[in-house]
Amino acid sequence: MSTVDKEELVQKAKLAEQSERYDDMAQAMKSVTETGVELSNEERNLLSVAYKNVVGARRSSWRVISSIEQKTESSARKQQLAREYRERVEKELREICYEVLGLLDKFLIPKASNPESKVFYLKMKGDYYRYLAEVATGETRNTVVDDSQAAYQDAFEISKGKMQPTHPIRLGLALNFSVFYYEILNSPDKACQLAKQAFDDAIAELDTLNEDSYKDSTLIMQLLRDNLTLWTSDTQGDGDEPQEGGDN
């Protein structure tokens, strides 16, 4: 693929983002990724935003349908229809996740030439295995949970050694890894400990905040604090869903 073709695909992705056509955006950035050339920071972010929206729509649908399916007052036929529809959404969600994981393993992680990119892509790998874990059951769930944790842990080790505590990618990783502990592993103590450590480490080094990433970093710090507040007050198990965000 020529440089011109690649630039056109990136431009298409930007147009698709502006018009909120995230499936088109994802396909354009998938084609860019498949050229095998390392992505620039801008291209990396376009890819991430595209697939986050594509998979996010399915995750949201899945939660709504699952909730309807579990309502005991529904008739057997309605429950069956809800189950079938949930399974259809699940299939779409799985296909998207494995598409992203394929791009990560085949192109993105092997080509990552600096710690920032490596952490970004390993975090992404952890995220997409986590999304699979949200809908998986049995042995399949155990496998994707292990894969998610391994990717997050690899990213976490690199970020601690190579990135400032205020770096938005390091903070975003801590945010999502803590959500993984809370939601997927059902380990609120570990989730709180990880989130608090990341928040405290960033506060201690606020003077290292890069002007360019100030907004991103402080937003993720706020999300970490929001989650800590929610998780520490959630002793009654009122079913509030922990917030997740801050993917850059």
Swiss-Prot record:
<keyword id="KW-0963">Cytoplasm</keyword>
<dbReference type="GO" id="GO:0005737">
    <property type="term" value="C:cytoplasm"/>
</dbReference>
<dbReference type="InterPro" id="IPR036815">
    <property type="entry name" value="14-3-3_dom_sf"/>
</dbReference>
<comment type="function">
    <text>Adapter protein implicated in the regulation of a large spectrum of both general and specialized signaling pathways. Binds to a large number of partners, usually by recognition of a phosphoserine or phosphothreonine motif. Binding generally results in the modulation of the activity of the binding partner.</text>
</comment>
<dbReference type="InterPro" id="IPR000308">
    <property type="entry name" value="14-3-3"/>
</dbReference>
<dbReference type="InterPro" id="IPR023410">
    <property type="entry name" value="14-3-3_domain"/>
</dbReference>
<dbReference type="Pfam" id="PF00244">
    <property type="entry name" value="14-3-3"/>
</dbReference>
<comment type="subunit">
    <text>Homodimer.</text>
</comment>
<comment type="similarity">
    <text>Belongs to the 14-3-3 family.</text>
</comment>
<dbReference type="InterPro" id="IPR023409">
    <property type="entry name" value="14-3-3_CS"/>
</dbReference>
<protein>
    <recommendedName>
        <fullName>14-3-3 protein zeta</fullName>
    </recommendedName>
</protein>
